[in-house]
Amino acid sequence: MYIDTGIMSNNIFLFAFFALVGLTRIEAMPTKGSEGTWNVDYEDQEHTGITCRENEHYNSTRIECEDECNDRNNKLCYRFQQFCWCNEGYIRNSSHICVKLEDCLKDEEQKSETLASSANNDSSKRLEDDLKLFSHDSVSHTSLEPETQAQKFNGIIDQETLDLVFGKPENSSADNKPLETKTQAQKFNGIINEETLDLVFGKPENSWAENKPLETKTQAQKFNGIINEETLDLVFGKPENSWAENKPLETETQAQKFNGIINEETLDLVFGKPENSWAENKPLETKTQAQKFNGIINEETLDLVFGKPENSWAENKPLETKTQTQKFNGIIDQYTRRIVFVFSNI
């Protein structure tokens, strides 16, 4: 029987080669030691420079990527990719650490609850913000732009007029503001309510339309530096309207309304503060009289402007005649003047 020694030698060589490879593979397989760890032959790792952490073992033969807590769908990886694999019963979490499977499930549940809670909180906050936009508190200090309030002024106060009187929300009305400086205009934003309007301009049934102080831009311009009798009439009305000819603030009924309400802050809003050098926009005095007020608002100054109680108003009174002075007696007495026109010594 003839045997081809060449083929035989080749077969023996192949057999020996595969046997050697098989033994090498068996030696490289990890052996399970204590729970949570693996005893690994680090021979291959020495060649690759890879060192596995706790609960991991080295793997260079898998085709798929291992499972992760947030991704259970295996994806194809590069063949023979060399990396560390989580031990049996462990899974890699979002921090790339191998944890027990039950810990992974708990972590996912907590994340779901956190996300749901966060979504609910965001939804509640958005709802709360929306409600604030339409709440009474958020619209009750809108400095008098609502149409219903404008209608109360006998149909002649429009948006432009309100802006002239009280300033726009962004306080850009300082230039043509007839009564206030920009600082005072800012004070009006959010604090002018219906009661204040009634005190300053009268109620709708008082027919203030004819003598309304600031209806048009032209009238507003008149106030700048030219306070005269005509301007005062525009502001305070004429005698036939029972305003005591040039009575600066009130009829008897209106004077009663002011008692206990008009304080220093209100006077500042109406007439301006002393440091504003009252000359240009002051509704009661000429420039000379305005100069008297700067820093010297006291009892003597008030007497010069409004007269003394003992009917000696005629000599020094800048706005009224003796007849008008008599009209004041019994309405504005010393006590009332203190309440209405009192200023702290400046």
From Swiss-Prot:
TIL domain ranges (all copies): 52-104
Name of the protein this chain belongs to: Protease inhibitor Egf1.5b
Pfam families per record: TIL
Species of origin: Microplitis demolitor bracovirus (isolate Webb)
Binding partners and assembly: Interacts with host PAP1, PAP3 and SPH2.
The organism's place on the tree of life at top rank: Viruses
GO BP terms, alphabetized: symbiont-mediated suppression of host innate immune response
Gene that encodes it: O5
Function: Counteracts the host humoral immune response by inhibiting the processing and the amidolytic activity of host PAP1 and PAP3. Thereby, melanization of host hemolymph, normally producing several reactive intermediates toxic for viruses, is deregulated and proper immune response cannot occur.
InterPro entries: Ser_inhib-like_sf, TIL_dom
Signal peptide as annotated in the record: 1-28
Family: Belongs to the polydnaviridae EGF-like motif protein family.
Record's keyword terms, sorted: Host-virus interaction, Inhibition of host innate immune response by virus, Signal, Viral immunoevasion
CDD domains with a match to the protein in the record: TIL
Phylogenetic placement of the source organism: Viruses, Viruses incertae sedis, Polydnaviriformidae, Bracoviriform, Microplitis demolitor bracovirus
